[in-house]
Amino acid sequence: MIIFAIESSHDDTSFALLDDNKPIWMKTITQTEIHKQYGGTVPEIASRLHVKNIGILIEDIKSQININKIDLIAYTKEPGLVGSLHVGYVVAQSLALILNKKIVGLNHLEGHFYSAFIGKEVIYPALGLLVSGGHSQLVLYNSKDDFKIIGQTQDDAVGEVYDKVARKLNLGFPGGPLIDQIWKNNHKLYTAHLTIPKTEGFFDFSFSGIKTNVINLINNCASRNEQINVNQIATEFQNTIVEYLKEHMETAIKKFSPKCIVLAGGVSANFAIREMFYSLHKNVFLPDLEYTTDNAMMIARLAYEKFRYNN
């Protein structure tokens, strides 16, 4: 079964082909450099660029496969930027009508979970940690159709906090890779972490308090005319994030006894978080780095998981 997938929920335009869980081809056009000058994604600009980039990708895919051989067309239906999602939907719907193929709209967040299983089989029950710029969730998967969000952020997403802290430290955008690189160079020197937040929900997150702690540290240094130690603040910020996620995962593993644990989402590319994750369980699934950010292959993999049992 050959699945063609489209991902356009945010600022990446991505096409992919998957044949029975074997990746055939993927191409993603990112808009990061364009949005960097604005300090974040501008929805209207993102939509316009999706229209332009999809035209390029359509020409590319025609050179990869006889499109009549496609069995299923999948696209990201939700969540995401409304305009960006609509561009992907229109293209998917048009191709489905032209080729007379089945079409399925899928959830972007579910796709991230299955990004760790591209070319692999899922082991249920699985405990997934989704960490990205827009979402932070703990999800327990008992099967492809039986899953429950057992915890989620009550305020900022973890990737969002990385961007805000990086901006306050004048590091640039996106903040995650920049802070992670500082951590790699300094974590043996700076081992402390900030206060770990507490939430009413046992498995919920609250990242805004960590962000506020960092901002207060910076503002206090500035008010005293002290030099801001960017390396120390960035490193101890990441130490805090890693410890916070680790505490939640350890508690959830003890309570639910999953057969495997899964890390997914854009922040899953973070070196420190990946290293921590491997220490938690004997069966650990992480996406390859090319599949950590938004991509169509994860949507194709989700479609394969859903559709192969319902054919």
Curated annotation (Swiss-Prot):
Fe cation binds at residues 108, 112, 294. It catalyses: L-threonylcarbamoyladenylate + adenosine(37) in tRNA = N(6)-L-threonylcarbamoyladenosine(37) in tRNA + AMP + H(+). Binds 1 Fe(2+) ion per subunit. One of its GO terms (molecular function) is N(6)-L-threonylcarbamoyladenine synthase activity. Keywords: Acyltransferase, Cytoplasm, Iron, Metal-binding, Transferase, tRNA processing. It is an enzyme of class 2 (transferase). GO terms for cellular component: cytoplasm. NCBIfam families: gcp_kae1 (TIGR00329), T6A_TsaD_YgjD (TIGR03723). This is tRNA N6-adenosine threonylcarbamoyltransferase. The gene is tsaD.
